[in-house]
Amino acid sequence: MLKWSTLCFRFVRAMQQALFLTIFFHMQIFCIAFTYNSTFKCSLITTSSLTCYKVLSTLYTQNSSKVYSTESTLYLFLNLSSTGF
């Protein structure tokens, strides 16, 4: 399994490239909410959730126009056990 920091970084990079379908089938994070006020909230039942939150929030802040465009809230449910990504 990938480290959380790597997993979250790849998640955001894929979001920037609009690979929503690829992400959905190849990764799993229990719940990630993208909110309109430029914040990330990760609901992860692991001890590494804080690391994931920091990586996501940093990348989102730097690339907000690419990561988020129209919807006020987007929820993705993905599979952590997958190794295809």
Swiss-Prot record:
The lineage of its organism: Viruses, Duplodnaviria, Heunggongvirae, Peploviricota, Herviviricetes. It comes from Saimiriine herpesvirus 2 (strain 488) (SaHV-2). This is Uncharacterized 9.9 kDa protein in DHFR 3'region.
